[in-house]
Amino acid sequence: MVRKRKLGASASCEAEDANCAENAIDRFSNLPDEVAHRILSFLSFKDLTRVGAVSKRCRQFHLSVPVVSFDYSSCKPRGVTNQKIVKLMSSLDRYLRYRGDHRMQVFSINWSCFGSEQASKFFRVITWIVNAVRCNVEVLDLRLACDFLALPSCVFLSKSLQSLSVHLTWMILEAPSVSFSSNLCYLKLEKVTIVDERFFK
């Protein structure tokens, strides 16, 4: 009798937990886009991806959030290997591909692990930047530990980009060779070596 009562109580608790979880998801899913985006803007890329797996509506929020922060230190895998680094980079590749042209206000990259095959990984980082510009990014924040950074010309030709911050580890930063007229209102260069004066013309 006691055992039956315990089983009944356990089943009741599980049912309540399931209902609570379902209601919590529904409440979040029913939020206005701007409210949900505001909440998600505080999440790391790893947590943002988890939210996107909860429901179809959450996936819509996840793919249209205007603030995207990809910080290697917050989502690096345990026992780092080159294979795991590539897998991590591929997750952002997929995200930006599925995101399409949803407008992006802020795109922040903090990437300090290039490991082997640096050229391939560097190309992927440049592709992320190009994708962010395609999404009409307004604020671009780059913190990279690479030997050399040549920013693509689309960064300086962008009509939406207003703020650009670049932090390197005393490595070379090169502006595109073509002339450009930028709409930048804010430029911050930290721990960089400038190849020439094109940045300031």
Residue ranges and their predicted role:
Residues 1-11:
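PEST-like, low-complexity acidic/proline-rich intrinsically disordered segments
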Residues 2, 18-201:
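Leucine-rich repeat
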